């Protein structure tokens, strides 16, 4: 992994093709929310399939908790769709057969020249693509458990949600004055929030 990809740095805003053939940037997919980014070997790898199956349940929680999940692999668009459908995932999968991310981050898995995948990583991102934590998943047990990711999201949300603890006197006073700027959805309508999630 590139030396500048560390906690506190801003992760590159890659633009890739999603499972539906649409060009997407990571920042657009993230919106104003925390995001878990999975850099995957691809659908051929049983470890990655098992990891994605585990993420299906967490993703249901992330949807109601206003957090995002994205997977990037070096698979082509057909294999990307087979991978996504095969694990019953409902989050965006990005296809990078040109290995833009692999090359830019210097994470070619040189021990597998036949598939030439990325070394698997899971990156927890604060809003603005700010790196909170990086997990190296070359070995399966280097990858975070669902509970570790849940704890990471809790820590990130505590940092980025000004209304994390609405029992504080200052927030109560804001609410009573009609000042809703520090309360979710932070000056937006719910219609705008739901539109951003598409």
Where are the regions a protein language model picked out?
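Chalcogenol-based redox active-site neighborhoods
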Residues: 1-198
């Amino acid at each position: 992994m590139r030396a500048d990809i560390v906690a506190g740095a801003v992760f590159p805003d890659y633009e890739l093709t999603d499972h539906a053939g649409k060009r997407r940037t990571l920042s657009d997919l993230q919106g104003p929310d925390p995001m878990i980014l999975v850099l995957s070997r691809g659908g051929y790898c049983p470890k990655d399939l098992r990891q994605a199956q585990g993420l299906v349940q967490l993703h249901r929680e992330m949807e109601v908790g206003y957090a995002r999940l994205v997977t990037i692999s070096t698979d082509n668009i057909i294999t990307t769709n087979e991978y996504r459908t095969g694990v019953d995932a409902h989050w965006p999968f990005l296809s990078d057969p040109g290995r833009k991310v692999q090359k830019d981050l210097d994470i070619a898995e040189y021990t597998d020249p036949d598939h030439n995948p990325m070394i698997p990583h899971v990156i927890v991102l604060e809003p603005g693509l700010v790196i909170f934590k990086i997990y190296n998943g070359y070995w399966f047990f280097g990858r975070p458990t669902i509970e570790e990711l849940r704890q990471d999201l809790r820590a990130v949300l505590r940092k980025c949600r000004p209304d994390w603890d609405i029992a504080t006197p200052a927030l109560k006073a804001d609410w009573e004055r009609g000042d809703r700027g520090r309360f979710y959805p932070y000056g937006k309508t719910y219609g705008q929030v739901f539109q951003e999630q598409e």
